[in-house]
Swiss-Prot record:
Gene3D superfamilies: 3.30.70.2380. It comes from Toxoplasma gondii. Residues 1-20 are annotated as: Disordered. Glycans are attached at N34. This is Antigen H4. InterPro entries: MIC5-like. It comes from the Eukaryota. Keywords: Glycoprotein.
């Protein structure tokens, strides 16, 4: 069930330029920028940076892009994904 939620709400891609990075994309509806606001204001960006990754916000398209190195532990990745999905759910956003 958890895997289904991940497929629904968060896309995971191998970074074309850098195969050592995993890219997560959270897409919001145009009128809703709640996730990106929350990701900027809470500890997400700090945690992502601590894992050696980066977070960027494409405000016109409503996409929040998170890149994490493959060196991040599976536990850290799972915890971060869990927190992202919980945040999306709590905001009532319908991720695409």
């Amino acid at each position: 069930e958890f895997q289904e939620e991940i497929k629904e709400g968060v896309e995971e891609h191998k970074h074309e330029d850098d195969p050592e990075m995993t890219r997560l994309m959270v897409t919001e509806k145009q009128e809703s920028k709640n996730f990106s606001k929350m990701a900027k204001s809470q500890s997400f960006s700090t945690r992502i940076e601590e894992l050696g990754g980066s977070i960027s916000f494409l405000t016109e398209t409503g996409v929040t892009m998170i890149e994490l190195p493959k060196t991040a532990s599976e536990h850290d990745m799972d915890q971060l994904l869990h927190d992202i999905l919980a945040a999306v759910e709590s905001l009532g956003s319908t991720p695409r």
